[in-house]
């Protein structure tokens, strides 16, 4: 049996590949998508020419390539680096945060640091950059490269994310996009053009997508800094919701999405279920397998898929129950689905502390 549900789906794909577009690919393609190899096709775009060269030098998959370029809504709209990566208001709010004060403290050292260290501090603007006067319009780039099918779109460029997302307006259906992952801001105004979560959410719901996961990153102010979650200055254990990661996908089982869901191929639906599993929302994947059992059954064994998803849900269990047994315990209203009432036991505190030490924000993509 495959080690994961995405690996199972990758084995069963016959005619389609898993096509991924990563806009803001510094650090590389997320390792979880490698489960689709050798049926993984990906294009990474990043403003750091230094990073794109590094990634290309390490890449062994001939179907994955990297483009060093800034992205824009128009090819004749050069990038003004002097204005900062984000809107003026966002920049002013960002400057109030403790991670920016740490950046200031380390500024001189970072100028001479390695590109890897600069990226660890999100100081990508200090690395060797692509030509800001020659940005690319991503949908046009896809056309030039012969990309007519795209499963997964990820955007994280620390600035004009919403502007770039809108360049795909009217193209999600023609490209066959099933999932979108974006960095979003929880600060800003009510203006419809700003890169904020509420504008992103409205736009993507209008394009036929629904929210399946939302990770919130809190940031403390420099007036009273909180402890950082990671070894580098970024989000903190407390503070205001500043940014986050939003995960949108096609909800093919929703009544108001039935028509669009009916246009997806069997392999697209299988890949969608694999995306849910990769996002650590295996319940959505299981619901899709059950709701589209007749459609998916010719492609792979549904019960095997459900067992893998049930095992994913029981990650802390040495011997996970099968899907059927797991559901039986739930239907029996087993105490296993609840935390005991009363004070938190000492063993649970120790277990939680140990888990928190090794996984400070577990499975965050």
What annotation goes with each model-predicted range?
Residues 1-365:
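Phosphate/nucleotide-binding beta-alpha loop and adjacent structural elements of enzyme active sites
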């Amino acid at each position: 049996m495959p080690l994961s549900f995405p690996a199972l789906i990758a084995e069963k794909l016959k005619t389609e590949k898993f096509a991924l577009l990563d806009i803001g690919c510094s650090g590389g393609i997320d390792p979880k998508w490698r489960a689709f190899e050798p049926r993984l096709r990906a294009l990474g775009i990043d403003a750091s020419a230094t990073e794109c060269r590094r990634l290309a030098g390490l890449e062994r998959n001939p179907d994955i390539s990297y483009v060093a370029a800034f992205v824009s809504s128009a090819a004749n709209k050069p990038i003004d680096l002097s204005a900062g990566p984000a809107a003026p208001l966002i920049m002013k709010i960002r400057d109030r945060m403790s991670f920016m004060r740490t950046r200031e403290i380390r500024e001189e050292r970072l100028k001479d640091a390695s590109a890897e260290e600069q990226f660890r501090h999100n100081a990508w603007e200090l690395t060797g950059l692509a030509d800001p006067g020659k940005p690319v319009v991503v949908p046009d780039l896809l056309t030039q490269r012969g990309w007519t099918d795209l499963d997964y779109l990820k955007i994280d460029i620390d600035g004009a994310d919403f502007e770039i997302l809108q360049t795909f307006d009217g193209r999600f259906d023609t490209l066959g996009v099933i999932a979108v992952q974006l960095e979003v801001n929880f600060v800003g105004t009510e203006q419809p053009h700003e890169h904020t979560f509420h504008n992103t959410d409205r736009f993507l719901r209008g394009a036929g997508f629904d929210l399946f996961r939302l990770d919130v990153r809190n940031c403390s102010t420099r007036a009273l800094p909180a402890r950082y979650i990671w070894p580098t200055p970024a989000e903190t254990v407390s503070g205001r919701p500043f940014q986050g990661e939003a995960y949108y996908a096609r909800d093919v089982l929703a009544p108001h999405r039935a028509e669009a869901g009916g246009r997806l191929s069997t392999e697209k639906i299988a890949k969608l279920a694999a995306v849910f599993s990769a996002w650590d929302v295996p319940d959505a994947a299981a619901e899709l397998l059950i709701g589209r059992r007749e459609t998916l059954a010719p492609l792979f064994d549904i019960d095997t898929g459900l067992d893998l998803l049930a095992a994913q849900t029981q990650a802390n269990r040495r011997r996970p129950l099968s899907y059927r047994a797991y559901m039986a315990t739930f239907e029996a209203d087993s105490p296993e689905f609840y935390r005991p009432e009363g004070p938190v036991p000492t063993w649970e505190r120790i277990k939680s502390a140990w888990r928190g030490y090794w996984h400070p924000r577990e499975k965050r993509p």
